[in-house]
């Protein structure tokens, strides 16, 4: 009899209906990985932000769904089904089941952990649908998981440079360019969710991974395109990493150029791709005179992306180590102390001196 292998997909989560928007936002902003303040302050800030932002955010969700909910769970289920089917082919002697663990809405991490425990998994692989590691996303999900599930598990921390993943991005970008009529004078904007500068300065490797991925993509698109990285979805008065996506769109549009904009940190369609990139920033481009504005679709169930996830799970199952990146061992240069492999070695009393690769 083969193994029971549970693959747990981490993602952000999203409200099911308009009535869920405010409690979803409250869950998000009271996470200590997001608002780095003492508990009483964090709860007050979460209540304030969720109350102030809920009306506008509700309108944005209503643009995507008549019930005012997020498509993220639906899209994640499609990815889970595709991954489970591929793993079943690769592991015919084992029983593989994919579970979804959302951080800020149902099915919560705690619910997924209870399901995995009830199923009686022999192996558990934690697979974030965040390609780049950040303490604010994967790090937060891992913390919640280890509080909820006391059994052993293997972690895939990041896979931003995996070959099929990079190729899938390029494929989506070129397909969007074809749909746009193959325009010239192209600026390709590779947009990722922003982070406060203080998070990056504390050792979070997210920005480094995003920008290294962007360099890989830039080397595979037409040489006459101008390619740049930008960061969206800023919240609050803190200083964030940049340049901001909205400002880059305005700057390039003022030159009358054709804009292709691709999400490189979001792998599923949701409010930040469909509304922010698809609608709000389109208006900015039109206002500033862009020749055209084309949004590249998120990877979704692109075969290259599902192949990436499949390969990472298989590799994790074959390793003695409990944490894996797409490089096998540690991916990040030694300066990024927020890397989970660095933290693991620090806990074991190992001095960190190695570099990327």
Curated annotation (Swiss-Prot):
Cellular component, GO annotation: cytoplasm
InterPro entries named among the record's database cross-references: Ferrochelatase, Ferrochelatase_AS, Ferrochelatase_C, Ferrochelatase_N
Keyword entries, A-Z: Cytoplasm, Heme biosynthesis, Iron, Lyase, Metal-binding, Porphyrin biosynthesis
Catalytic reaction(s) noted: heme b + 2 H(+) = protoporphyrin IX + Fe(2+)
Annotated GO biological process: heme biosynthetic process
Enzyme Commission number(s) of this protein: 4.98.1.1
Pathway where this protein functions: Porphyrin-containing compound metabolism; protoheme biosynthesis; protoheme from protoporphyrin-IX: step 1/1
Binding positions for Fe cation per the UniProt entry: 193, 272
Compartmental location: Cytoplasm
Highest taxon listed in the record's lineage: Bacteria
One function term, GO molecular function aspect: metal ion binding
Signal peptide: none
Similarity field: Belongs to the ferrochelatase family.
Purpose: Catalyzes the ferrous insertion into protoporphyrin IX.
NCBIfam families associated with the record: hemH
Annotated protein name in UniProt: Ferrochelatase
Gene: hemH
